[in-house]
Amino acid sequence: DRYKQLIGQMALLPIVNRGIPIVADDYVESDFGTGVVKITPAHDFNDFEIGKRHDLPIINILNFDGTLNKEVPKQYHGLNVDEARKLVLKELEDLGQLVKTEPYKVQIPRSERSNSILQPLITNQWFVNVEKLSEEAIRVVENNETQFIPKNWENTYFNWMNEIQDWCISRQLWWGHRIPAWFGPDKRIFVELNQKAAEKAAELHYGKKVVLKQDDDVLDTWFSSALWPFSTLGWPDETADLKKYYPTNVLVTGFDIIFFWVARMMMMGIHFMDGQIPFKEVYIHALVRDEKGQKMSKSKGNVMDP
């Protein structure tokens, strides 16, 4: 209620001199601080969702190398984020619009491997709609067709599955299973088992042979891992091993990958194996930690040499 008279009006963004709309959204806690936040839909996960709800423009200001692009004033072109921040402060001060500067703690996303600060960037990716897939995977655990040991880890499984979102399965890496998608000369996409099949489909569509370019992205490692219970046994062929060993009795794993691996194996197994669960029991073991209680990781350098 404090700012309802401002909703629907515009604020002027300094330096850029662009009008930005003032909107109301439940994401903001009205009784916390000023009850007002600035959002950047192209460079923050929560802001992106708010931007979609209010049909706000998605303005990306970053190049892939982390420098600023031509969506910003000319004096900022090519600067990295740290350089740009310093120049913003100087320009605001020169304009007489800088009220104060003070140290302020905020949550900043960092790479779990390099510890570098992450700068979110809007890009085109491949997604799997897993909402329907999750429904049956939830049901079989609720009905004890698959059981967690200890049983309390079912809560972690359900928490993830009940809040599941579309799964981004594409990665921009040098190593991995290449996404089986090919682009035609007009960017039409052909998804096939191999390039020969894609070329055949493209020839039927265009009425002639054309040059196709395969997508450079690779699959999320957890995608191929999700197929492990049956793909290692000869699937999609109906092999003797597949008939004998699928489903298996027990999966032994750590609690930290219940969602990343266990849940996805459940969804993929049930979907591709005619409703059959991949395993009957999931045995969750403890994690070996270092003397400070931290998970052992190559990136942290706290792994013991065996």
Can you say where each PLM-predicted feature lies in the sequence?
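Conserved oxyanion/phosphate-binding beta-strand-loop segments in alpha/beta enzyme cores
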Residues: 1-27, 56, 116-139, 206-237
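A short, compositionally biased
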Residues: 2-9, 55-56, 104-106, 175-180, ...
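Residue patterns forming the tRNA-binding/recognition surfaces of aminoacyl-tRNA synthetases
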Residues: 18, 27, 31-186, 211, ...
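Conserved active-site neighborhood of enzyme catalytic/cofactor-binding cores
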Residues: 37-39, 43, 66, 143-149, ...
